[in-house]
Design a protein with these regions (language model features):
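Non-catalytic all-alpha helical scaffold/repeat segments
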Residues: 1-201
C-alpha cells in the first residue's frame, strides 16, 4: 500500500493519511527509507520530484513523526542538492517535534562545512529564525568579511530569499523569532547596505 501511494501523481491518495494515522511507525519507516535513498542518490542542481517533494508539499500530517529522523539525517550528511535541503528543512522547521535548540545546533554545525554562497545563506536563515540576536550579529560580521562587493550583494539577496520566500514554489518554513520590530529593523538596514536598488531583482 505504501509503495502504491508514493507513486501517485500530484501528492498522495486521500486514504494515505488515514493509513499513516492507523500505522504511523510502519508508514514512517517506509517513508524514511525512501527519502534516505532519494538523498543518497541526489544529483546537485537536479530536482528529483519523488517522495521528498510530496512529503514537503502535502504531507504535513506526517511532519512531526518524521522530523526527528530527518534532523538526524541532516546532522550526519552534507547535502549537495539545494532542492533536497530546502525540502528537508521545510519539514524539520515546520514540525513541532524539532526544537529551536535543535535548529541552532544544526545551523551552527552546517555553517562550518558549507562551501557555497547559497548553502551558507540557507544556514544563516535557519539560525536567524530561531536565535536572531546572535545570528544577525554573526551575519553582519560574515557579510563584512566578504571581500567582493558583488559577492556581498549575492549573499545578501540569497539570504533574504531563504529567510522569506524559500526556493522554488514552496514557501519557507523558517521560524519567526526574528519577526520583531527590533530585529526586522536590523535586518532591513543590513540588507540595505549590501543590496543596491539597481541590483535588486
Amino acid at each position: 500500500a505504501c509503495r502504491y501511494a508514493v507513486h501517485e501523481l500530484n501528492g498522495f491518495p486521500p486514504w494515505f493519511p488515514r493509513l499513516f494515522e492507523g500505522h504511523p511507525d510502519i508508514v514512517s519507516e517506509f517513508v524514511l527509507s525512501e527519502i534516505k535513498q532519494e538523498v543518497a542518490s541526489e544529483i546537485p542542481g537536479t530536482e528529483s520530484h519523488y517522495l521528498l517533494s510530496d512529503v514537503s508539499s502535502s504531507g504535513q500530517w506526517a511532519w512531526d513523526q518524521l522530523a526527528p529522523a530527518l534532523l538526524k539525517l541532516l546532522l550526519e550528511h552534507n547535502l549537495t542538492n539545494a532542492f533536497n535541503l530546502g525540502k528537508l528543512l521545510r519539514i524539520v522547521q515546520g514540525s513541532t517535534s524539532v526544537t529551536d535548540d535543535d535548529l541552532i545546533l544544526l545551523a551552527g554545525q552546517k555553517m562550518k562545512s558549507a562551501d557555497t554562497i547559497e548553502f551558507v545563506a540557507i544556514w544563516y536563515a535557519v539560525w536567524v529564525g530561531v536565535e536572531p540576536e546572535k545570528a544577525i550579529s554573526a551575519l553582519t560580521g560574515h557579510l563584512s568579511s566578504i571581500s567582493s562587493a558583488m559577492e556581498q550583494t549575492e549573499f545578501a539577496m540569497t539570504f533574504v530569499t531563504q529567510l522569506s520566500a524559500g526556493r522554488g514554489s514552496e514557501p519557507t518554513r523558517v521560524r519567526q523569532a526574528y519577526v520583531t520590530p527590533r530585529h526586522l529593523k536590523k535586518l532591513f538596514l543590513l540588507m540595505h547596505t549590501y543590496i543596491r536598488e539597481d541590483e535588486d531583482i
